[in-house]
Amino acid sequence: MNDLVNHPEHYQGKVECIDCLESATEGLNGIEAVCTANAIKYLYRWKRKNGKEDLLKAQWYINHLIEHIDGDSTNA
C-alpha cells in the first residue's frame, strides 16, 4: 500500500527528497530556502508525478529566486 503521507511514490528514489532538501537549504533563510527547496522538489518528482507541469513550477521558483538575488545588493 502506498503511504501518501510518509512515503509517497513520487518522492521515492535512492535518496529521500526530504534529505536532499535539508542539505540543499542548509544556511539559507527565508525566500531563498523556500525557492530552492521547491525547485528541487519539483525537479525530483517531475517524471513520477506531473511531468511538464512540475518542470514549469521548478522553473518558476528558480526565476523567482534569481529575481530575489538580483534585487538584493547583499548577494554578490
Residue locations for each model-derived region?
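Intrinsically disordered, low-complexity regulatory regions
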Residues: 1-76
